[in-house]
């Protein structure tokens, strides 16, 4: 064995490559071993350093891959064990144990997290060269007994199913120990680069290689100053020193110092020396030179997005200077926090990148499909799960529009559960859903699912066969191919499909002869899919590499950007959270020779120093270290390592907000510039100098010219809620000339509430989602229908009997039966409605002096050639003197207010009066009024009554009165009925004023509507709060920002309010 160390200013790779070349020139086969996370980059670096740029004598690889070179022909043809297969094996083992067999873990048998921890423990045991029987000294002895039962049973299953329990390194070590590879190894030289420690498995293999190979060469970075130190605790080279010292002591060899021809920039060397002096308690009498600072940058940004954008701009600048993507490395302090943001931002700046991390399959449509399938079976055809399965794009041959239509209907009809999905759809609504088409679609969905879900408990092999048959019926494979829209997506889908088929194969192999329920089968496949990962190799090498900062090696790239280096992530504190605590691992390590667990927490300090040292030397030209103030929406402090750099004299640059400038980094990329222009266009204006204004004026002029060529336009600002008028063509279609505009009292109210709401409802005809469940509209229809029946019954039957008959016959109507007999909630609503009818009906019984002339009367009120007002009058009454009045049933409290009417928000009663005046017989000239009847079950506070007497009854009937507009002429006739006439009497002239002003409101609205320009102007009564419909989700109206756009209502003092509003009405309607 040969141990080599060198300073950080030299290239260890060049030194080791020279050693490898010498061995190769002598005819030896050389294996150049690198850590798993670095083998790809190391291979490229080694080949670059070779004069011939390639050779068959030197193989750059990993320990695991090296073992396959020697054992590929002699290894038994057994099944391969991966994490998903291991999890299934442990699940099967736990299935065979009863809870009482496992005192410590019996309650966790079906827990997926517990199974994952078992998989991790089993892998750790293999790496540590330990068996489950070596787990002595645990906190609770019962834990070891449970683990022995579980793992031994799992290993028995592995043997039965012909799985290879040995790792590739174990098979390699066994072959060496048996002498099967002596001839090959005698002609082999092993060069090891990039390691600072070995696992127990690697350590054991290394001892065998040292005894059988021609030579083993190991290199590591250690300064000569550190190597000569006797006390190394806390030294930045502590990890490497321990590594070399342990190997030197074990193999009785002295490490040698070597140098390379390549020497890196002195700035990095001087920074390293300062860093070393800080941690070995020595002193230096010099500082960083001014030109050294050109190679280092410390950035501070407010949050992650700004930080990534600054990096992207800097990368674009490097490209402008002539460098390539492959010269740049981006390191992440927190991989999870940055992974989702860095991709879209780099795409915006058109920066190709390769993320050096396996992607989880959890977000792939295939996993979502399997999860929805499993949940559909478990939760009995829940609607959300069925729809998610369809929306994955992998079920059947359905267009998006068909799925949307199916979703709309199932939500309307409340289709959920197997019973409702299995029956034909028969309920329809005013929208007239295409039931024939929906039922055909229902059958295409239900039949294959029903065939699969009816599977009883049976052998796993049979369940897999049925699942595969189901997947063929729904054309899963064909749909999977159709998902990809780019070559990259094709490659991703191929990797996901491969993992999916591997999981099915493993399940068939492990559970093929075990009896399982379908729910267990789908749950196991779903768990395997969600935990699986895949990796896609970049199509080109000229990309920016992105990976976690703790995987970096010295001198990796010319330019390195390390971001997210907050106190919480730099240094990293690693802690185990498995089935064994660190204390238990340490006790096991004390009694085992050459076999040990890796305890990451015990090596946090020296490993973090080693990582920081590698990071500070990762670049060969320029290193940028960045820290955000806020990461994951949490404030964080500077890393202690960055504070040390500040003490060395490196300035901390506050990058600030990404304001646009005319620097190359801001305008050098069209796509990024366009996206930032749009972002600025959505923000409040910022102050600019005259030079800035001139520059951006020219840029915007150019951009608009380019956008017009592509038929694009910049969106308007969020806070300028202006609307565009409809085009002439649309106006002609919506409001054709010569045809009166159709309006109603409700439409007029909506218009004066918020013009844009009218546009949505009556021009675009947008409607809220319908539901079969009764709402206020259906409740109102029910009450109207009961009272219509009641008032039509002129028989001599007692009033109570007639009321019962009206309720009974209304309940028997098919529509109300569907609505109110669907479930217990609907039945409860019906019971409340019946109580309201019984409470309100006596009001009708008391008014014996009235006669009901008509009910549910349709009318069309002609207001000239411009407007046709339509509606339905609930009831027309006639008093004993022949005068007519209008009754409108309301399920909520309503009362006519002249101020609300003046502002256009309550035209209903006056509109009904105008319609009644038009349709009344010629011999009847007098109208006694228009009124609301609140259909309710009055609620009284009994605490306010001293005793239960006639006062209580009077209060009930007082709540059940007619409220509205009444003619002063008919005052005497109204006094005997249940009419609330106080402050509600109007003379004939005043009634005429109301009618004329009502016509003026319609004409004014119609004129504005026909112009086709609808404002976003919800009304406000006080100028401080907005009461009108704001439609925030559509208009983004914010009361505190857009109050100026709200329509201010006219309000007058209560004193003489009626007279003042009537005066205003006469003035505005030109009377």
Swiss-Prot record:
HAMAP family: AddB_type2. It holds the Pfam family PDDEXK_1. It comes from the Bacteria. This is ATP-dependent helicase/deoxyribonuclease subunit B. The heterodimer acts as both an ATP-dependent DNA helicase and an ATP-dependent, dual-direction single-stranded exonuclease. Recognizes the chi site generating a DNA molecule suitable for the initiation of homologous recombination. This subunit has 5' -> 3' nuclease activity but not helicase activity. NCBIfam families: rexB_recomb. The keyword Transmembrane helix does not apply. It comes from Streptococcus pyogenes serotype M5 (strain Manfredo). GO terms for biological process: double-strand break repair via homologous recombination. Heterodimer of AddA and RexB. GO terms for molecular function: 5'-3' exonuclease activity; ATP binding; double-stranded DNA binding; helicase activity; hydrolase activity, acting on acid anhydrides. Keywords: ATP-binding, DNA damage, DNA repair, DNA-binding, Exonuclease, Helicase, Hydrolase, Nuclease, Nucleotide-binding. Belongs to the helicase family. AddB/RexB type 2 subfamily. Its EC number is 3.1.-.-. Its cofactor is Mg(2+). Despite having helicase-like domains, this subunit does not have helicase activity.
């Amino acid at each position: 064995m040969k141990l080599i160390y060198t300073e950080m200013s030299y290239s260890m790779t060049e030194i080791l490559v020279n050693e490898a070349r010498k061995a190769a020139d002598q005819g030896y086969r050389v294996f150049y071993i690198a850590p798993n996370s670095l083998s790809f980059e190391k291979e490229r670096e080694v080949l670059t350093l070779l004069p011939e740029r390639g050779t068959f004598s030197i193989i750059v690889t990993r320990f695991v891959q090296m073992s396959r070179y020697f054992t590929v022909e002699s290894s038994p043809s057994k099944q391969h064990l991966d994490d998903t297969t291991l999890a299934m094996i442990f699940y099967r083992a736990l299935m065979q144990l009863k809870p009482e067999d496992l005192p410590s873990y019996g309650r966790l048998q079906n827990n997926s997290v517990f199974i994952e921890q078992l998989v991790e423990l089993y892998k750790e045991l293999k790496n540590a060269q330990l068996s489950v029987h070596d787990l002595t000294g645990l906190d609770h002895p019962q834990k070891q007994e449970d683990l022995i039962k579980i793992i031994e049973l799992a290993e028995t299953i592995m043997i039965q199913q012909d799985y290879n329990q040995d790792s590739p390194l174990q098979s390699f070590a066994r072959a060496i120990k048996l002498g099967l590879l002596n001839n090959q190894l005698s002609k082999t030289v092993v060069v090891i680069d990039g390691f600072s420690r070995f696992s127990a498995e690697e350590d054991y293999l290394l001892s065998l290689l040292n005894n059988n190979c021609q030579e083993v060469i190991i290199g590591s970075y250690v300064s000569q100053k550190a190597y000569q130190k006797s006390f190394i605790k806390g030294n930045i080279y502590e990890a490497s020193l321990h590594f070399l010292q342990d190997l030197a002591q074990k193999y009785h060899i002295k490490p040698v110092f070597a140098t390379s021809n390549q020497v890196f920039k002195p700035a990095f060397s001087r920074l390293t020396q300062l860093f070393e002096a800080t941690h070995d308690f020595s002193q230096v009498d010099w500082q960083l030179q001014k030109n050294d600072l050109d190679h280092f940058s410390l950035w501070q940004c407010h949050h992650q997005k700004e930080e990534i954008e600054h990096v992207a701009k800097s990368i674009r600048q490097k490209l402008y200077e002539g460098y390539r993507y492959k010269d740049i490395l981006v390191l992440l302090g927190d991989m999870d926090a940055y992974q989702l943001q860095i991709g879209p931002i780099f795409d915006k700046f058109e920066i190709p990148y390769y993320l050096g991390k396996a992607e989880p399959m959890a977000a792939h449509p295939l996993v979502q499909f399997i999860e929805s399938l499993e949940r559909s079976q478990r939760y009995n055809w829940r609607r959300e799960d069925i729809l998610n399965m369809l929306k994955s794009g992998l079920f059947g041959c359905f267009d998006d529009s068909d799925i949307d239509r199916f979703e709309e209907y199932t939500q309307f009809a409340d289709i959920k559960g197997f019973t409702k999905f299995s029956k034909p759809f028969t309920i329809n609504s005013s929208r007239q859903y295409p039931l024939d088409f929906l039922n055909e679609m229902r059958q295409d969905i239900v039949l294959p699912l029903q065939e699969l879900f009816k599977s009883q408990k049976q052998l796993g092999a049979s369940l897999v066969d049925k699942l595969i048959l189901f997947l063929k019926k729904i054309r899963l494979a064909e749909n999977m191919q159709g998902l990809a829209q780019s070559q990259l997506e094709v490659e991703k889908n191929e990797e996901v499909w491969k993992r999916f088929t591997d999981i099915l194969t493993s399940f068939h192999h492990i559970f093929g002869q075990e009896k399982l329920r379908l729910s267990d089968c789908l749950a196991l496949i779903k768990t395997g899919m969600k935990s699986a990962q895949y990796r896609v190799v970049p199509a080109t090498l000229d990309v920016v590499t992105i990976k976690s900062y703790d995987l970096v090696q010295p001198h990796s790239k010319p330019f390195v950007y390390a971001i997210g280096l907050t106190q919480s992530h730099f240094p990293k504190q690693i802690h185990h959270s498995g089935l064994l605590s660190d204390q238990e691992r340490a006790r096991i390590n004390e009694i085992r020779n050459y076999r040990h667990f890796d305890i990451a927490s015990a090596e946090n300090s020296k490993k973090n120093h080693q990582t920081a040292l590698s990071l500070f030397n990762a670049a060969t030209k320029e290193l940028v270290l960045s820290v955000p103030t806020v990461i994951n929406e949490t404030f964080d402090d500077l890393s202690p390592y960055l504070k040390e750099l500040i003490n060395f004299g490196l300035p901390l640059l506050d990058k600030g907000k990404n304001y646009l400038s005319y620097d190359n980094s801001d305008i050098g990329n069209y796509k990024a510039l366009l996206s930032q222009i749009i972002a600025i266009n959505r923000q409040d204006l910022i102050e600019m100098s005259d030079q800035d204004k001139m520059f951006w004026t020219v840029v915007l002029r150019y951009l608009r010219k380019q956008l017009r060529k592509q038929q694009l336009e910049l969106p308007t600002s969020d806070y300028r809620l202006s609307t565009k008028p409809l085009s002439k063509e649309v106006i002609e279609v919506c409001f054709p000339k010569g045809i009166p505009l159709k309006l109603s009292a409700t439409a007029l109210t909506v218009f004066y509430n918020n013009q844009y709401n009218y546009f949505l409802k009556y021009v675009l005809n947008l409607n809220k989602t319908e539901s079969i469940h009764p709402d206020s509209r259906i409740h109102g229809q029910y009450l109207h229908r009961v009272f219509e029946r009641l008032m039509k019954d002129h028989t001599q039957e007692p009033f109570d009997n007639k009321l019962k008959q009206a309720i009974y016959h209304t309940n028997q109507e098919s529509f109300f039966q569907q609505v109110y007999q669907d479930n217990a909630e609907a039945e409860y609503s019906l019971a409340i409605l019946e109580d309201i009818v019984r409470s309100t009906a006596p009001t009708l019984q008391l008014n014996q002096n009235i006669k009901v002339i008509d009910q549910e009367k349709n009318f069309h009120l002609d207001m000239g050639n411009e407007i046709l007002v339509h509606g339905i009058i609930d009831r027309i009454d006639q008093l004993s003197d022949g005068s007519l009045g209008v009754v409108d049933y309301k399920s909520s409290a309503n009362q006519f207010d002249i101020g609300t009417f003046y502002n256009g928000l309550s035209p209903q009663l006056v509109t009904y009066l105008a319609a009644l005046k038009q349709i009344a017989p010629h011999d009847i000239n007098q109208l006694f009024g228009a009124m609301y009847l609140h259909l309710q079950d009055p609620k009284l506070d009994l605490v306010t009554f001293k005793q239960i007497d006639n006062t209580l009854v009077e209060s009930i009937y007082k709540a059940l009165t007619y409220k509205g507009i009444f003619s002063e002429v008919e005052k005497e006739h109204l006094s005997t009925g249940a009419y609330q006439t106080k402050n509600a009497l109007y003379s004939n002239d005043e009634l005429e004023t109301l009618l004329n002003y009502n016509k003026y409101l319609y004409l004014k609205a119609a004129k504005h509507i026909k112009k086709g320009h609808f404002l976003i102007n919800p009304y406000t009564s006080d100028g401080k709060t907005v009461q009108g419909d704001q439609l925030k989700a559509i208009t983004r109206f914010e009361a505190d920002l857009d109050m100026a756009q709200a329509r201010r209502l006219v309000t007058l003092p209560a004193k003489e309010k009626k007279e003042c509003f009537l005066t205003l009405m006469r003035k505005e309607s030109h009377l």
